[in-house]
């Protein structure tokens, strides 16, 4: 009798242990699932609350205020505060002249005054590509290096570290949007845009763009992809009328990939370039501006807000 009881006790112990493990594992999974569901509900509630705030603000806005919010204006040389109140701009863009002779403390005080003068919080942006295009870091002892130099020295890790430093600096002076990264491709080192690119192929540039915009978003700084749909090896469109004879298929195979990577990663701003594309049929019956917006919407997964 004792011999029969002993195996039964062993089996019972075995099933209790295994059953306990299964029950414990099940409870753990339920806790994890419950936490995930709670997080998702919190996120949905947060988004709903944000949308509600925006909708309430829109209802209370005048037509003039709504129109003004469409403009991201360069800071005028005079009457900066008055213009914010008169035209209800959505934001101000800070360029080289705005930083001349200023300290970081001066810039923070300046952006604080801009925000205080605006009824609606401003989007304050500035170029800080690094290298040949620096704004705020130009008043520092050591300006930021170009993405080309950084990538050659330290790869993507150097890019990530640099982006974090830029985000911290911009936020410290009240700048909440960066007019970078440059998403252009250029194969010719003598091309106008080459020194401002990462100097790599489409796939590597796409990875670079994704890293930068994601890092900026983590640090709560906006980003801008430029110059859509890609400068290529063309000349300087600031000083001349440039014609790009590439087809839509050619652009899709390479130049558009970095822009798509940025769109897939975060909500993004596009910076368009003024170059004529005779091989794109969509330009025949539209103004240049409408054509570029139509092209951006239909050649990428971009949603126009």
Annotate each language-model stretch with its function.
Residues 2-29:
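Sec-dependent N-terminal signal peptides of Gram-positive bacterial secreted proteins and lipoproteins
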Residues 42-44, 49, 80-81, 86-88, ...:
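Short leucine-rich amphipathic alpha-helices used at interfaces
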Residues 62, 100-112, 207-305:
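Second-shell residues forming the walls of enzyme active-site clefts
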Residues 66-69, 87-92, 118-122, 171-176, ...:
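Loop/turn elements at helix/coil->beta-strand transitions in domains of secreted/extracellular proteins
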Residues 70-75, 124:
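Short, hydrophobic beta-strand segments that form beta-sheet elements in well-ordered domains
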Residues 74-86, 158-169, 251-258:
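Short, acidic/polar
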Residues 86-205, 232-244, 273-283:
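Enzymes and membrane/adaptor proteins characterized by extended Gly/Ser/Thr/Asp/Glu-rich
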